[in-house]
Amino acid sequence: MQKKQLWERYKNLLYHDAELELSVDTSRIDFPEGFLEEMEPRLQQAYQEMEALEKGAVANPDENRMVGHYWLRAPEQAPEAALSEEITSTLAAIKAFASSVHGGNIAAPDGHRFTDLLIIGIGGSALGPQFVADSLGGPGDRLRIWFFDNTDPDGMDKVLSRIGTALKQTLVVVISKSGGTKETRNGMLEARRAFERAGLHFAAHAVAVTGSGSELDGTASWESWLGVFPMWDWVGGRTSVTSAVGLLPAALQGIDVERLLAGARACDQKTRSRVTRENPAALLALSWFHATRGKGARDMVLLPYKDRLLLFSRYLQQLIMESLGKELDRDGNRVLQGIAVYGNKGSTDQHAYVQQLREGVHNFFVTFIEVLKDREGPSLEVEPGATSGDYLSGFFQGTRAALYEKGRESVTITVRELSPVSIGALIALYERAVGLYASLVNVNAYHQPGVEAGKKAAGAVLKLQGEIVEMLRRQPNREFTGEEMALALARPEEVETVFMILRHLAANGDHGVSVTVKDKIWENKYRSKG
Protein backbone atom coordinates (compact mmCIF):
# COMPACT_ATOMS: atom_id res chain seq x y z
CA MET A 1 0.00 0.00 0.00
CA GLN A 2 1.39 3.41 -0.98
CA LYS A 3 1.99 6.12 1.62
CA LYS A 4 -0.83 8.25 0.24
CA GLN A 5 -3.21 5.31 0.56
CA LEU A 6 -2.02 4.68 4.10
CA TRP A 7 -2.71 8.31 4.94
CA GLU A 8 -6.27 8.01 3.68
CA ARG A 9 -6.70 4.77 5.61
CA TYR A 10 -5.32 6.49 8.73
CA LYS A 11 -7.89 9.30 8.42
CA ASN A 12 -10.68 6.81 7.83
CA LEU A 13 -9.93 4.59 10.82
CA LEU A 14 -8.49 7.03 13.38
CA TYR A 15 -10.36 7.56 16.64
CA HIS A 16 -9.47 10.87 18.29
CA ASP A 17 -11.01 12.45 21.35
CA ALA A 18 -10.09 16.09 21.90
CA GLU A 19 -11.36 16.12 25.49
CA LEU A 20 -9.26 13.15 26.57
CA GLU A 21 -6.44 14.05 24.17
CA LEU A 22 -6.41 10.38 23.25
CA SER A 23 -6.11 8.73 19.84
CA VAL A 24 -6.48 5.10 18.78
CA ASP A 25 -5.04 4.32 15.35
CA THR A 26 -6.05 0.95 13.88
CA SER A 27 -4.99 1.77 10.32
CA ARG A 28 -2.12 -0.72 10.48
CA ILE A 29 -4.48 -3.57 11.30
CA ASP A 30 -5.44 -5.11 7.97
CA PHE A 31 -9.18 -5.34 8.44
CA PRO A 32 -10.61 -6.85 5.24
CA GLU A 33 -13.35 -5.06 3.38
CA GLY A 34 -16.62 -5.36 5.28
CA PHE A 35 -15.04 -6.70 8.49
CA LEU A 36 -16.40 -3.96 10.75
CA GLU A 37 -19.90 -4.40 9.34
CA GLU A 38 -19.67 -8.18 9.67
CA MET A 39 -18.69 -7.90 13.35
CA GLU A 40 -21.36 -5.33 14.19
CA PRO A 41 -24.06 -7.78 15.42
CA ARG A 42 -21.58 -9.44 17.77
CA LEU A 43 -20.44 -6.06 19.04
CA GLN A 44 -24.00 -4.95 19.69
CA GLN A 45 -24.46 -8.08 21.79
CA ALA A 46 -21.23 -7.23 23.65
CA TYR A 47 -22.54 -3.72 24.32
CA GLN A 48 -25.75 -5.17 25.75
CA GLU A 49 -23.80 -7.49 28.03
CA MET A 50 -21.63 -4.61 29.19
CA GLU A 51 -24.68 -2.47 29.94
CA ALA A 52 -26.21 -5.30 31.97
CA LEU A 53 -22.94 -5.71 33.87
CA GLU A 54 -22.90 -2.03 34.78
CA LYS A 55 -26.50 -2.27 35.97
CA GLY A 56 -25.57 -5.00 38.43
CA ALA A 57 -26.20 -8.26 36.59
CA VAL A 58 -24.30 -11.26 37.93
CA ALA A 59 -21.38 -11.29 35.51
CA ASN A 60 -19.29 -13.83 37.42
CA PRO A 61 -21.62 -16.83 37.77
CA ASP A 62 -18.87 -19.02 39.26
CA GLU A 63 -18.99 -16.90 42.41
CA ASN A 64 -22.49 -15.43 41.95
CA ARG A 65 -21.05 -11.93 42.04
CA MET A 66 -21.64 -8.63 40.36
CA VAL A 67 -18.69 -6.96 38.65
CA GLY A 68 -18.61 -3.29 39.54
CA HIS A 69 -15.25 -1.69 38.91
CA TYR A 70 -16.89 0.88 36.62
CA TRP A 71 -18.92 2.18 39.57
CA LEU A 72 -15.71 3.15 41.36
CA ARG A 73 -15.37 6.27 39.21
CA ALA A 74 -19.11 6.81 38.77
CA PRO A 75 -20.78 5.87 42.07
CA GLU A 76 -24.14 7.03 40.77
CA GLN A 77 -24.01 4.12 38.29
CA ALA A 78 -24.08 1.54 41.10
CA PRO A 79 -27.37 -0.40 41.23
CA GLU A 80 -27.93 0.27 44.94
CA ALA A 81 -27.78 3.53 46.86
CA ALA A 82 -25.85 1.83 49.66
CA LEU A 83 -23.08 0.86 47.24
CA SER A 84 -22.90 4.40 45.88
CA GLU A 85 -22.59 5.80 49.38
CA GLU A 86 -19.91 3.28 50.34
CA ILE A 87 -17.82 4.12 47.27
CA THR A 88 -18.14 7.85 47.92
CA SER A 89 -17.38 7.60 51.63
CA THR A 90 -14.37 5.36 51.01
CA LEU A 91 -12.85 7.88 48.61
CA ALA A 92 -13.41 10.65 51.15
CA ALA A 93 -11.79 8.52 53.86
CA ILE A 94 -8.78 7.80 51.63
CA LYS A 95 -8.25 11.49 50.92
CA ALA A 96 -8.68 12.42 54.57
CA PHE A 97 -6.24 9.73 55.71
CA ALA A 98 -3.61 10.78 53.16
CA SER A 99 -4.03 14.42 54.14
CA SER A 100 -3.57 13.53 57.81
CA VAL A 101 -0.41 11.59 57.01
CA HIS A 102 1.01 14.41 54.89
CA GLY A 103 0.14 16.96 57.55
CA GLY A 104 1.66 14.94 60.37
CA ASN A 105 -1.59 14.38 62.25
CA ILE A 106 -1.11 10.67 61.62
CA ALA A 107 2.57 10.15 62.33
CA ALA A 108 5.14 7.60 63.37
CA PRO A 109 5.22 6.71 67.08
CA ASP A 110 8.27 8.96 67.59
CA GLY A 111 6.21 11.93 66.42
CA HIS A 112 8.04 12.36 63.12
CA ARG A 113 6.12 12.41 59.87
CA PHE A 114 6.07 9.31 57.74
CA THR A 115 8.59 9.58 54.90
CA ASP A 116 8.29 6.14 53.29
CA LEU A 117 5.47 3.86 52.21
CA LEU A 118 5.73 0.06 51.95
CA ILE A 119 2.97 -1.66 49.98
CA ILE A 120 2.53 -5.39 50.59
CA GLY A 121 0.41 -7.19 48.01
CA ILE A 122 0.57 -9.45 44.98
CA GLY A 123 -1.13 -9.70 41.60
CA GLY A 124 -3.69 -6.95 41.17
CA SER A 125 -2.92 -5.75 44.68
CA ALA A 126 0.55 -4.75 43.48
CA LEU A 127 0.63 -4.46 39.69
CA GLY A 128 -1.89 -1.62 39.46
CA PRO A 129 -0.39 0.41 42.31
CA GLN A 130 3.12 -0.17 40.91
CA PHE A 131 2.09 1.02 37.46
CA VAL A 132 0.44 4.17 38.80
CA ALA A 133 3.34 4.90 41.15
CA ASP A 134 5.98 4.50 38.45
CA SER A 135 4.10 6.38 35.73
CA LEU A 136 3.13 9.38 37.86
CA GLY A 137 5.69 9.48 40.66
CA GLY A 138 8.60 11.90 40.85
CA PRO A 139 10.87 13.96 43.05
CA GLY A 140 7.89 15.78 44.52
CA ASP A 141 6.32 12.62 45.98
CA ARG A 142 5.05 13.06 49.52
CA LEU A 143 6.24 9.56 50.46
CA ARG A 144 8.87 7.32 48.90
CA ILE A 145 7.10 4.16 47.80
CA TRP A 146 8.34 0.56 48.04
CA PHE A 147 6.76 -2.82 47.35
CA PHE A 148 6.79 -6.36 48.69
CA ASP A 149 5.10 -8.06 45.72
CA ASN A 150 6.41 -11.61 46.09
CA THR A 151 7.31 -14.18 48.72
CA ASP A 152 11.02 -14.02 47.79
CA PRO A 153 13.01 -13.51 51.02
CA ASP A 154 15.99 -11.99 49.22
CA GLY A 155 13.72 -9.56 47.39
CA MET A 156 12.21 -8.40 50.66
CA ASP A 157 15.65 -8.07 52.24
CA LYS A 158 16.70 -5.89 49.31
CA VAL A 159 13.75 -3.54 49.81
CA LEU A 160 14.33 -3.34 53.57
CA SER A 161 18.01 -2.57 53.05
CA ARG A 162 17.06 0.32 50.79
CA ILE A 163 14.58 1.67 53.32
CA GLY A 164 17.29 1.39 55.95
CA THR A 165 16.95 3.58 59.03
CA ALA A 166 13.85 5.21 57.53
CA LEU A 167 11.92 2.13 58.68
CA LYS A 168 10.96 4.02 61.83
CA GLN A 169 9.15 6.53 59.61
CA THR A 170 7.67 3.98 57.20
CA LEU A 171 3.94 3.46 56.78
CA VAL A 172 2.93 -0.07 55.72
CA VAL A 173 -0.18 -0.84 53.66
CA VAL A 174 -1.12 -4.53 53.52
CA ILE A 175 -3.51 -5.37 50.66
CA SER A 176 -5.42 -8.66 50.51
CA LYS A 177 -9.13 -9.16 49.91
CA SER A 178 -9.33 -12.50 51.71
CA GLY A 179 -6.49 -11.84 54.10
CA GLY A 180 -5.33 -15.38 53.41
CA THR A 181 -3.15 -14.83 50.35
CA LYS A 182 0.05 -16.59 51.37
CA GLU A 183 2.48 -14.31 49.57
CA THR A 184 0.94 -11.23 51.18
CA ARG A 185 0.73 -12.88 54.59
CA ASN A 186 4.40 -13.85 54.31
CA GLY A 187 5.34 -10.30 53.36
CA MET A 188 3.41 -8.93 56.33
CA LEU A 189 5.18 -11.34 58.69
CA GLU A 190 8.58 -10.45 57.23
CA ALA A 191 7.82 -6.76 57.63
CA ARG A 192 6.56 -7.29 61.17
CA ARG A 193 9.81 -9.06 62.09
CA ALA A 194 11.88 -6.24 60.57
CA PHE A 195 9.99 -3.68 62.65
CA GLU A 196 10.33 -5.75 65.82
CA ARG A 197 14.07 -6.20 65.27
CA ALA A 198 14.35 -2.43 64.97
CA GLY A 199 12.50 -2.04 68.27
CA LEU A 200 9.38 -0.72 66.55
CA HIS A 201 5.71 -1.57 67.09
CA PHE A 202 4.40 -2.82 63.74
CA ALA A 203 0.72 -2.05 64.38
CA ALA A 204 1.53 1.63 64.90
CA HIS A 205 2.76 1.75 61.29
CA ALA A 206 0.19 -0.52 59.63
CA VAL A 207 -2.88 -0.02 57.45
CA ALA A 208 -5.03 -2.73 55.84
CA VAL A 209 -6.99 -2.82 52.60
CA THR A 210 -9.11 -5.95 52.86
CA GLY A 211 -12.54 -7.52 52.77
CA SER A 212 -14.90 -7.00 55.67
CA GLY A 213 -14.58 -9.83 58.18
CA SER A 214 -11.42 -11.25 56.62
CA GLU A 215 -8.55 -12.66 58.64
CA LEU A 216 -6.56 -9.50 57.90
CA ASP A 217 -9.50 -7.33 58.96
CA GLY A 218 -9.59 -9.19 62.26
CA THR A 219 -5.85 -8.78 62.81
CA ALA A 220 -5.99 -5.05 62.07
CA SER A 221 -8.92 -4.57 64.43
CA TRP A 222 -7.44 -6.66 67.25
CA GLU A 223 -4.07 -4.90 67.06
CA SER A 224 -5.54 -1.40 66.53
CA TRP A 225 -3.86 -0.66 63.22
CA LEU A 226 -3.92 2.91 61.93
CA GLY A 227 -6.74 2.22 59.51
CA VAL A 228 -8.71 -0.32 57.49
CA PHE A 229 -10.10 0.36 54.01
CA PRO A 230 -12.53 -1.92 52.16
CA MET A 231 -12.06 -4.34 49.30
CA TRP A 232 -15.46 -5.33 47.95
CA ASP A 233 -16.24 -8.77 46.55
CA TRP A 234 -17.61 -7.16 43.39
CA VAL A 235 -14.19 -5.75 42.45
CA GLY A 236 -11.67 -8.22 41.06
CA GLY A 237 -7.98 -7.83 41.82
CA ARG A 238 -6.97 -7.04 38.24
CA THR A 239 -9.59 -4.29 37.99
CA SER A 240 -9.06 -2.87 41.47
CA VAL A 241 -6.65 -0.03 40.73
CA THR A 242 -9.41 2.60 41.00
CA SER A 243 -10.54 1.18 44.36
CA ALA A 244 -8.75 1.63 47.68
CA VAL A 245 -6.19 -0.89 46.38
CA GLY A 246 -4.77 1.70 44.01
CA LEU A 247 -6.16 4.96 45.33
CA LEU A 248 -4.78 4.72 48.87
CA PRO A 249 -1.15 4.17 47.80
CA ALA A 250 -1.48 6.82 45.09
CA ALA A 251 -2.98 9.39 47.46
CA LEU A 252 -0.29 8.71 50.06
CA GLN A 253 2.37 9.10 47.38
CA GLY A 254 0.87 12.49 46.55
CA ILE A 255 -0.85 11.69 43.26
CA ASP A 256 -4.12 13.50 42.51
CA VAL A 257 -6.56 10.60 42.72
CA GLU A 258 -9.55 12.76 41.79
CA ARG A 259 -7.94 13.47 38.42
CA LEU A 260 -7.07 9.79 37.99
CA LEU A 261 -10.71 8.91 38.56
CA ALA A 262 -11.82 11.75 36.29
CA GLY A 263 -9.75 10.33 33.44
CA ALA A 264 -11.17 6.86 33.96
CA ARG A 265 -14.70 8.24 34.24
CA ALA A 266 -14.39 10.27 31.03
CA CYS A 267 -13.04 7.27 29.14
CA ASP A 268 -15.84 5.09 30.51
CA GLN A 269 -18.34 7.55 29.08
CA LYS A 270 -16.71 7.34 25.65
CA THR A 271 -16.51 3.55 25.70
CA ARG A 272 -20.21 3.14 26.49
CA SER A 273 -21.02 4.32 22.98
CA ARG A 274 -22.78 1.77 20.79
CA VAL A 275 -21.49 3.50 17.68
CA THR A 276 -18.44 1.34 17.09
CA ARG A 277 -16.35 3.91 15.24
CA GLU A 278 -16.88 6.28 18.18
CA ASN A 279 -15.88 3.70 20.79
CA PRO A 280 -12.09 3.34 21.23
CA ALA A 281 -12.38 0.21 23.38
CA ALA A 282 -14.50 -1.49 20.73
CA LEU A 283 -11.92 -0.59 18.07
CA LEU A 284 -9.22 -2.15 20.24
CA ALA A 285 -11.28 -5.29 20.77
CA LEU A 286 -11.90 -5.59 17.03
CA SER A 287 -8.19 -5.16 16.34
CA TRP A 288 -7.36 -7.94 18.77
CA PHE A 289 -10.04 -10.17 17.27
CA HIS A 290 -8.74 -9.71 13.74
CA ALA A 291 -5.04 -9.91 14.63
CA THR A 292 -5.46 -13.08 16.73
CA ARG A 293 -8.15 -14.64 14.49
CA GLY A 294 -10.35 -14.55 17.56
CA LYS A 295 -8.44 -17.55 18.90
CA GLY A 296 -5.30 -16.10 20.45
CA ALA A 297 -3.32 -17.08 17.35
CA ARG A 298 -0.92 -14.16 17.82
CA ASP A 299 0.71 -12.50 20.81
CA MET A 300 0.40 -8.85 21.74
CA VAL A 301 3.74 -7.03 21.95
CA LEU A 302 3.42 -3.79 23.89
CA LEU A 303 5.90 -1.06 22.97
CA PRO A 304 5.42 2.15 24.97
CA TYR A 305 7.79 4.88 23.84
CA LYS A 306 8.06 6.34 27.32
CA ASP A 307 10.15 5.13 30.25
CA ARG A 308 7.34 5.91 32.70
CA LEU A 309 5.14 3.34 30.93
CA LEU A 310 7.63 0.51 31.42
CA LEU A 311 5.32 -1.27 33.88
CA PHE A 312 2.26 -0.93 31.64
CA SER A 313 3.04 -4.23 29.92
CA ARG A 314 3.20 -6.04 33.28
CA TYR A 315 -0.08 -4.47 34.34
CA LEU A 316 -1.72 -5.45 31.05
CA GLN A 317 -0.29 -8.96 31.23
CA GLN A 318 -2.49 -9.66 34.22
CA LEU A 319 -5.50 -7.67 33.04
CA ILE A 320 -5.57 -9.32 29.61
CA MET A 321 -4.13 -12.79 30.22
CA GLU A 322 -5.93 -13.54 33.48
CA SER A 323 -9.20 -12.28 32.01
CA LEU A 324 -9.02 -13.92 28.59
CA GLY A 325 -6.84 -16.98 29.15
CA LYS A 326 -9.57 -19.59 29.62
CA GLU A 327 -9.85 -23.28 28.82
CA LEU A 328 -13.64 -23.22 28.58
CA ASP A 329 -16.06 -20.73 27.11
CA ARG A 330 -19.26 -19.66 28.84
CA ASP A 331 -21.11 -22.62 27.31
CA GLY A 332 -18.62 -25.14 28.66
CA ASN A 333 -16.88 -25.79 25.35
CA ARG A 334 -13.12 -26.34 25.41
CA VAL A 335 -11.68 -23.38 23.49
CA LEU A 336 -8.22 -22.59 24.97
CA GLN A 337 -8.62 -18.84 24.59
CA GLY A 338 -6.24 -16.02 25.47
CA ILE A 339 -3.78 -13.42 24.20
CA ALA A 340 -0.18 -13.54 25.42
CA VAL A 341 1.15 -10.08 26.30
CA TYR A 342 4.76 -9.04 26.64
CA GLY A 343 6.92 -6.01 26.06
CA ASN A 344 9.37 -3.55 27.51
CA LYS A 345 9.84 -0.05 26.09
CA GLY A 346 10.96 1.80 23.01
CA SER A 347 13.49 2.54 21.77
CA THR A 348 15.30 0.02 23.96
CA ASP A 349 13.50 -2.86 22.28
CA GLN A 350 14.78 -1.81 18.87
CA HIS A 351 18.16 -2.97 20.15
CA ALA A 352 16.71 -6.20 21.56
CA TYR A 353 13.91 -8.21 19.94
CA VAL A 354 12.54 -5.94 17.19
CA GLN A 355 14.91 -7.76 14.83
CA GLN A 356 12.77 -10.87 15.23
CA LEU A 357 9.55 -8.89 15.02
CA ARG A 358 10.51 -7.58 11.61
CA GLU A 359 12.21 -10.59 10.08
CA GLY A 360 11.43 -13.64 12.22
CA VAL A 361 8.38 -15.72 13.01
CA HIS A 362 5.16 -13.79 12.45
CA ASN A 363 3.25 -14.74 15.59
CA PHE A 364 2.38 -11.32 17.02
CA PHE A 365 0.90 -7.89 16.55
CA VAL A 366 2.23 -4.72 18.17
CA THR A 367 0.60 -2.08 20.32
CA PHE A 368 2.58 1.16 20.27
CA ILE A 369 1.97 3.74 22.99
CA GLU A 370 3.01 7.25 21.96
CA VAL A 371 3.26 10.20 24.35
CA LEU A 372 3.53 13.51 22.50
CA LYS A 373 4.99 15.64 25.29
CA ASP A 374 8.65 14.82 25.89
CA ARG A 375 9.29 16.45 29.27
CA GLU A 376 8.56 19.40 31.49
CA GLY A 377 10.61 22.37 30.31
CA PRO A 378 12.84 22.88 27.28
CA SER A 379 15.05 20.19 25.77
CA LEU A 380 18.66 20.21 24.71
CA GLU A 381 19.41 20.07 21.00
CA VAL A 382 21.57 16.95 20.71
CA GLU A 383 22.30 18.01 17.15
CA PRO A 384 21.12 20.99 15.13
CA GLY A 385 17.32 20.99 15.05
CA ALA A 386 16.82 17.74 16.98
CA THR A 387 16.30 16.83 20.64
CA SER A 388 16.43 13.47 22.41
CA GLY A 389 12.63 13.46 22.34
CA ASP A 390 12.65 14.05 18.59
CA TYR A 391 14.80 10.97 18.25
CA LEU A 392 12.41 8.94 20.42
CA SER A 393 9.51 9.98 18.20
CA GLY A 394 11.52 9.23 15.09
CA PHE A 395 12.42 5.76 16.33
CA PHE A 396 8.77 5.04 17.10
CA GLN A 397 7.61 6.14 13.66
CA GLY A 398 10.45 4.31 11.97
CA THR A 399 9.76 1.05 13.79
CA ARG A 400 6.04 1.25 13.03
CA ALA A 401 6.79 1.78 9.34
CA ALA A 402 9.50 -0.89 9.17
CA LEU A 403 7.24 -3.49 10.74
CA TYR A 404 4.26 -2.73 8.52
CA GLU A 405 6.52 -2.85 5.48
CA LYS A 406 6.98 -6.53 6.34
CA GLY A 407 3.27 -7.10 6.93
CA ARG A 408 3.51 -6.85 10.71
CA GLU A 409 0.30 -5.29 12.03
CA SER A 410 0.07 -2.73 14.81
CA VAL A 411 -2.23 -0.49 16.82
CA THR A 412 -1.03 2.90 18.04
CA ILE A 413 -2.46 4.65 21.09
CA THR A 414 -1.44 8.28 21.49
CA VAL A 415 -1.85 10.56 24.50
CA ARG A 416 -0.67 14.15 24.67
CA GLU A 417 1.11 13.77 28.01
CA LEU A 418 1.32 11.53 31.04
CA SER A 419 -0.90 12.82 33.82
CA PRO A 420 -3.34 11.35 36.31
CA VAL A 421 -6.09 11.97 33.75
CA SER A 422 -4.36 10.16 30.88
CA ILE A 423 -3.28 7.24 33.08
CA GLY A 424 -6.85 6.90 34.35
CA ALA A 425 -8.09 6.94 30.77
CA LEU A 426 -5.62 4.24 29.68
CA ILE A 427 -6.68 2.03 32.59
CA ALA A 428 -10.37 2.43 31.74
CA LEU A 429 -9.75 1.96 28.01
CA TYR A 430 -8.15 -1.43 28.48
CA GLU A 431 -10.60 -2.60 31.13
CA ARG A 432 -13.45 -2.00 28.69
CA ALA A 433 -11.60 -3.48 25.71
CA VAL A 434 -10.98 -6.68 27.66
CA GLY A 435 -14.65 -6.96 28.62
CA LEU A 436 -15.85 -6.40 25.05
CA TYR A 437 -13.33 -8.84 23.58
CA ALA A 438 -14.35 -11.48 26.13
CA SER A 439 -17.93 -11.14 24.92
CA LEU A 440 -16.82 -11.48 21.30
CA VAL A 441 -15.07 -14.79 22.04
CA ASN A 442 -17.66 -15.90 24.64
CA VAL A 443 -15.44 -16.33 27.70
CA ASN A 444 -15.92 -15.22 31.29
CA ALA A 445 -13.44 -12.39 31.81
CA TYR A 446 -14.10 -12.14 35.52
CA HIS A 447 -12.92 -15.40 37.06
CA GLN A 448 -9.54 -17.16 37.26
CA PRO A 449 -9.89 -20.90 37.96
CA GLY A 450 -6.33 -21.58 36.84
CA VAL A 451 -4.95 -19.33 39.56
CA GLU A 452 -6.86 -21.25 42.20
CA ALA A 453 -5.52 -24.54 40.82
CA GLY A 454 -1.97 -23.25 41.19
CA LYS A 455 -2.61 -22.21 44.79
CA LYS A 456 -3.95 -25.67 45.64
CA ALA A 457 -0.94 -27.35 44.02
CA ALA A 458 1.43 -25.12 45.99
CA GLY A 459 -0.38 -26.05 49.17
CA ALA A 460 0.12 -29.74 48.39
CA VAL A 461 3.86 -29.15 47.95
CA LEU A 462 4.12 -27.43 51.34
CA LYS A 463 2.18 -30.26 52.96
CA LEU A 464 4.56 -32.80 51.44
CA GLN A 465 7.52 -30.74 52.66
CA GLY A 466 6.18 -30.99 56.19
CA GLU A 467 6.02 -34.78 55.87
CA ILE A 468 9.60 -34.90 54.59
CA VAL A 469 10.97 -32.76 57.41
CA GLU A 470 9.11 -34.87 59.96
CA MET A 471 10.52 -38.09 58.47
CA LEU A 472 14.07 -36.72 58.58
CA ARG A 473 13.70 -35.61 62.19
CA ARG A 474 12.28 -38.95 63.27
CA GLN A 475 15.27 -40.76 61.77
CA PRO A 476 18.23 -38.39 62.32
CA ASN A 477 20.85 -41.06 61.64
CA ARG A 478 19.45 -42.12 58.29
CA GLU A 479 20.25 -40.63 54.89
CA PHE A 480 17.70 -40.61 52.09
CA THR A 481 17.91 -40.13 48.35
CA GLY A 482 14.87 -38.54 46.77
CA GLU A 483 13.67 -41.94 45.61
CA GLU A 484 14.19 -43.49 49.05
CA MET A 485 12.29 -40.67 50.74
CA ALA A 486 9.39 -40.98 48.30
CA LEU A 487 9.16 -44.71 49.04
CA ALA A 488 9.43 -44.13 52.80
CA LEU A 489 6.49 -41.74 52.59
CA ALA A 490 4.55 -44.18 50.39
CA ARG A 491 4.47 -41.44 47.75
CA PRO A 492 6.53 -42.99 44.91
CA GLU A 493 4.59 -41.05 42.27
CA GLU A 494 5.79 -37.80 43.86
CA VAL A 495 9.50 -38.63 43.60
CA GLU A 496 10.37 -35.60 41.46
CA THR A 497 8.63 -33.22 43.84
CA VAL A 498 10.29 -34.93 46.81
CA PHE A 499 13.71 -34.51 45.17
CA MET A 500 13.11 -30.81 44.47
CA ILE A 501 11.94 -30.22 48.05
CA LEU A 502 15.01 -31.95 49.50
CA ARG A 503 17.33 -29.95 47.27
CA HIS A 504 15.74 -26.69 48.42
CA LEU A 505 15.78 -27.68 52.09
CA ALA A 506 19.50 -28.48 51.95
CA ALA A 507 20.31 -25.13 50.30
CA ASN A 508 18.82 -23.26 53.27
CA GLY A 509 19.62 -23.70 56.93
CA ASP A 510 16.12 -23.07 58.24
CA HIS A 511 15.05 -26.73 58.54
CA GLY A 512 18.35 -28.32 59.56
CA VAL A 513 18.81 -30.54 56.50
CA SER A 514 22.26 -31.47 55.15
CA VAL A 515 23.28 -33.14 51.88
CA THR A 516 25.97 -35.63 50.92
CA VAL A 517 26.83 -34.88 47.30
CA LYS A 518 27.18 -37.79 44.87
CA ASP A 519 28.33 -37.95 41.24
CA LYS A 520 24.75 -37.98 40.02
CA ILE A 521 22.61 -35.26 41.55
CA TRP A 522 19.59 -37.51 41.92
CA GLU A 523 21.70 -39.86 44.08
CA ASN A 524 22.51 -37.12 46.62
CA LYS A 525 21.64 -38.17 50.16
CA TYR A 526 19.85 -35.97 52.67
CA ARG A 527 19.61 -36.16 56.44
CA SER A 528 18.61 -34.12 59.44
CA LYS A 529 21.43 -32.31 61.18
CA GLY A 530 19.88 -33.46 64.43
UniProtKB/Swiss-Prot annotation:
EC code(s) of this entry: 5.3.1.9
Keywords per UniProt: Cytoplasm, Gluconeogenesis, Glycolysis, Isomerase
Family matches, as InterPro entries: G6P_Isomerase, Phosphoglucose_isomerase_CS, SIS_dom_sf, SIS_PGI_1, SIS_PGI_2
Localisation: Cytoplasm
One GO location term (cellular component): cytosol
GO biological process: gluconeogenesis; glucose 6-phosphate metabolic process; glycolytic process
EC category name: isomerase
Catalytic reactions of this protein: alpha-D-glucose 6-phosphate = beta-D-fructose 6-phosphate
CDD domains per the UniProt record, alphabetical: SIS_PGI_1, SIS_PGI_2
Record GO terms (molecular function): carbohydrate derivative binding; glucose-6-phosphate isomerase activity; monosaccharide binding
Pathway annotation from the record: Carbohydrate biosynthesis; gluconeogenesis; Carbohydrate degradation; glycolysis; D-glyceraldehyde 3-phosphate and glycerone phosphate from D-glucose: step 2/4
Enzyme active site: E322 (proton donor), H351, K455
NCBIfam families for this protein: PRK14096.1
Protein family: Belongs to the GPI family.
Function field: Catalyzes the reversible isomerization of glucose-6-phosphate to fructose-6-phosphate.
Name of the protein: Glucose-6-phosphate isomerase
Organism: Geobacter sp. (strain M21)
